[in-house]
């Protein structure tokens, strides 16, 4: 008799995706982050669901309802902080996952890569609308500043902003619709994630060498299930350590002050995971230019497969490209730091130089280095 997991219509799908899936025998721990992202998504949906049971999306009670969750709901404090810090873990895994894709040339699976970029945009949108919900000072002013950027769009800008606000300022209507978006987006992300996996399983996984591994595959279970469990345990340990020892480490103290449209915080800044893009936005002394640079800083990922000039897929055997890749990482860390600093003398110029270098590395320097490496292969 054939095994039920190979014949049952539903079990068959799970079997082909998680059990009998042929996987390259040499994929490293950098390939763990896909499953960790799935775990983060499940965790965020579950903690978010329990938070939504007690939260009220109304300007007069939103802040109080979050306080009520932390003080009066059984284990409400840990659910709230797991959700807030879970978002940070989500972005850490996301950025490492993208970095892995860039380093090892996984972007050559174009459909998988493009859906991945779409997933990134969706997760960023979800995190942004979610940050508005506690209705603290940074929630309110962050929402005001970022939605206001749309007014830079010629002709329809101001109408668009008022349409998103549902009025003439960020108010009750804005909070209600942001809560609705924050609830629906994770389910759209889940659907996209399934499509992402569908396209990945059409081609099979890449591996650190970038060389096809069709002749050397091993079953996903037990090898990579065990490996993933180790990653999951480390992720949960990190998240629990952060949540139980310093839950507010990555948050902004200003968000413990209820939203007040009459008082602007000294420094308006988003959560740490948006700071690199925020720094690029601020580096351009023109509203429309800044908005375009902000968009391009993310959408440039779509161009990466088209900029592939190397004969080798992975950077494993390309020292020049490796140097430029790590320069890009250092540049992104610099931008993240600049985004959190006030707009003052040394920071402005450093931010502008880091922004120029970011685009220069991806669009010019890395493709050029690849061409030079191709020539060196002939020596």
Curated annotation (Swiss-Prot):
It comes from the Eukaryota. Gene3D superfamilies: Cytochrome Bc1 Complex, Chain C (1.20.810.10). Binds 2 heme b groups non-covalently. A ubiquinone binds at residue 201. It holds the Pfam family Cytochrome_B. The keyword Transport applies. Its cofactor is heme b. It is found in: Mitochondrion inner membrane. One of its GO terms (cellular component) is mitochondrial inner membrane. GO terms for molecular function: metal ion binding; ubiquinol-cytochrome-c reductase activity. This is Cytochrome b. It comes from Neophocaena phocaenoides (Finless porpoise).
